[in-house]
Amino acid sequence: MMDAVAPASDAGPDLAAIAADASGERAVGRPTVYVYEAPVRICHWVNAFSIIVLMVTGYLIGTPLPTVAGEASDNFVMGYIRFAHFAAGQVLAVFFLTRILWAFVGNHHSRQIFYIPVHRKQFWKEVLHEIRWYAFLEREPKMYVGHNPLAQTAMFTGFTLFVAFMIVTGFALYSEGQGIDSWQHKLFGWVFAIWPNSQDVHTWHHLGMWALVVFVMVHIYAAVREDIMSRQSIISSMISGERQFRD
């Protein structure tokens, strides 16, 4: 299941690895591996754009712009912001669901962000190694075809769980305006059984936004850092689908 790669610079190509696809098999000695399929990459960038729109519009909804003079119909800025927030939320929900469905039919790497192999001691040993690497306590990085164990843990908790929470609470809040007969209320109205006070749901939804802001900043930093320091492609891999090992 683990897809660690530690290609030695003086090692020759491994023919078995060259014949392997990105299904989780080792790819020692292979400079380029096709990892992220097109649906994974499309969902990644659509979700990323949607989350950015949701963050900006969500912040403005929580901290509205100053009131301006004149007819409301002539100054509908907050209305447009609210509409953009709702639209981006529905786009995120559709592509997040698509991403989940693709995990059932895609390759091994398409499933990594949806689980953590908590029962595997080796996984946690490699998580600790990655923490030491990010803390500049390790001299050499380990290379992986897909996500490294720390990244897999971060993606599962910081993306999968957080985004699911935001979608559920977001649609629950949206159902208040749609009414109890709406599909949003029928699917997500149970949230108010947990937090009967609507303001509590607003508060948790707002806190979730800031948690995602932190995750996005760490995610971008880690991707850029690994692209430079670990000598393997990270950012371009989510464009081309291929992981390149430079050393």
From Swiss-Prot:
GO terms for cellular component: plasma membrane. This is Probable Ni/Fe-hydrogenase B-type cytochrome subunit. The gene is hupC. One of its GO terms (biological process) is respiratory electron transport chain. Belongs to the HupC/HyaC/HydC family. Coiled coil: none annotated. Keywords: Cell membrane, Electron transport, Heme, Iron, Membrane, Metal-binding, Transmembrane, Transmembrane helix, Transport. It is a multi-pass membrane protein. Its main location: membrane. One of its GO terms (molecular function) is iron ion binding.
